[in-house]
């Protein structure tokens, strides 16, 4: 659909589970982009899956037709056998192809298997690669093949490909000789809150626990974390916050591994005030991943002023810079030693806390992400609706 420079864009987004949702990083990204674009006056439609929250129907929220100016449409979804992502993206792509859209934005590699269809109907198609999903351990042979097929469709048909890390950018250049655009995720400044619900529900107090927050999937390195933590001499608890994502057996394995250790707590999926309290009162935040796209949970943890310890994969180490610590990916011994060091040296963690929030909010800003994305859509005369204000971010953390 042609559009004049001063007209709003009609945008469709697909590939996520639901919006609004915190079921994964993709859902957070789609929520931030779509609502901010709608605030700018663009017409945005998000195609949501039908069915239940991946961590259980107890986390289902109200079914909405509109959220903060964004239209929400639900598409047919097959819930069985890991087919939800594939079937929902197929039907979303069909609707987007026949809809009156200027731009169709595909999120994640698998959904890009249908990118050719709206392209065939003259839509401008953008793909965001949130990570090299075919490498994830949870997928079987067919799923991995299909995701890789989606990756190749993005390479062949997408007008622009957005990547979230320079490591993935290098992968596309070396594998396909395809140019991509590096647009890392953003983060919003956060206000710390007191421990209240987490004390009542889990007996947790400020600075008395080590926090992992994310999906319970094999590539997050949770096996290493539990094994390493068991060897650390500390009174601090280990809190593993997050739900499964088609990985119920893996979640069961983790809980069996932690059985008998009263200091390890599994909270399940968390959101809202509970999430804010966990971030605000952790002693350190740990992300031991083998594979990441760009970990939003790490950005969020730093925005709350946490001292962070991550694996040394580029997707994590590039984010924390000099404002955190890393261990050798997959090394239980190195992870154990770094955990022990941080538990024994509160002055070191406090020093990192003082700098992490200001650093991360100054470096990664959602308004910048929106403006860069709109430029890739072909929007003209873009004005940042909420300019990046470093001074404001700095003030938010004075005295915290």
Which residues does each predicted region cover?
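A conserved mid-protein helix/loop that constitutes part of the nucleotide-sugar donor-binding site
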Residues: 28, 208, 212, 217-231
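Glycosyltransferase donor-sugar binding loop
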Residues: 50-52, 187, 213, 237-252, ...
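Membrane-proximal helix-turn-helix segments that form the acceptor-binding/catalytic region
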Residues: 94-97, 120, 144-161
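Nucleotide-activated donor-binding/catalytic signature segment of Leloir-type glycosyltransferases, i.e.
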Residues: 251-273
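Aromatic "clamp/platform" in nucleotide-sugar-dependent glycosyltransferases that forms part
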Residues: 290
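Short hydrophobic beta-strand element within catalytic cores of glycosyltransferases
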Residues: 307-310
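Conserved acidic donor-binding segment of nucleotide-sugar-dependent glycosyltransferases
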Residues: 325-333, 341-347
């Amino acid at each position: 659909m042609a559009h004049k420079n001063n007209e709003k864009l009609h945008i469709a987004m697909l590939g996520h589970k639901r919006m609004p949702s915190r079921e994964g990083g993709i859902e957070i990204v789609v929520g931030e982009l779509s609502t901010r674009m709608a605030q700018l006056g663009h017409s945005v439609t998000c195609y949501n899956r039908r069915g239940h929250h991946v961590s259980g129907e107890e986390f289902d929220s109200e079914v909405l037709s509109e959220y903060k100016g964004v239209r929400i449409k639900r598409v047919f979804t097959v819930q069985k056998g890991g087919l939800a992502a594939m079937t929902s993206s197929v039907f979303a792509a069909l609707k987007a192809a026949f809809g009156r859209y200027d731009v169709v934005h595909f999120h994640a590699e698998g959904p890009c298997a249908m990118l050719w269809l709206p392209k065939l109907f003259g839509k401008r198609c953008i793909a965001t690669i949130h990570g090299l999903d075919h490498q994830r351990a949870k997928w079987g042979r067919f799923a991995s093949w299909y995701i890789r097929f989606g990756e190749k469709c993005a390479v062949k048909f997408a007008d622009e490909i957005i990547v979230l890390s320079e490591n993935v950018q290098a992968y596309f250049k070396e594998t396909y000789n395809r140019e991509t655009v590096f647009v890392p995720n953003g983060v919003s400044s956060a206000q710390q809150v007191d421990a209240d619900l987490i004390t009542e529900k889990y007996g947790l107090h400020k600075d008395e626990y080590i926090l992992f927050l994310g999906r319970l999937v094999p590539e997050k390195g949770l096996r290493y974390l539990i094994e390493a933590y068991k060897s650390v001499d500390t009174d601090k608890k280990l809190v593993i916050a997050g739900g499964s994502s088609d990985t119920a057996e893996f979640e069961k394995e983790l809980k069996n591994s932690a059985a008998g250790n009263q200091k390890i707590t599994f909270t399940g999926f968390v959101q809202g005030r509970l999430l804010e309290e966990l971030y605000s009162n952790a002693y350190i935040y740990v992300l031991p991943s083998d594979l990441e796209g760009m970990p939003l949970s790490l950005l969020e943890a730093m925005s709350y002023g946490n001292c962070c310890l991550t694996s040394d994969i580029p997707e994590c180490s590039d984010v924390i810079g000099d404002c955190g610590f890393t261990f050798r990916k997959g090394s239980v011994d190195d992870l154990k030693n770094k955990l022990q060091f941080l538990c024994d040296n509160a002055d070191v963690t406090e020093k990192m806390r003082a700098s992490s929030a200001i650093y991360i909010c100054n470096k990664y800003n959602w308004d910048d992400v929106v403006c860069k994305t709109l430029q890739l859509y072909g929007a003209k005369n873009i004005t940042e609706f909420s300019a990046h204000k470093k001074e404001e971010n700095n003030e938010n953390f004075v005295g915290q």
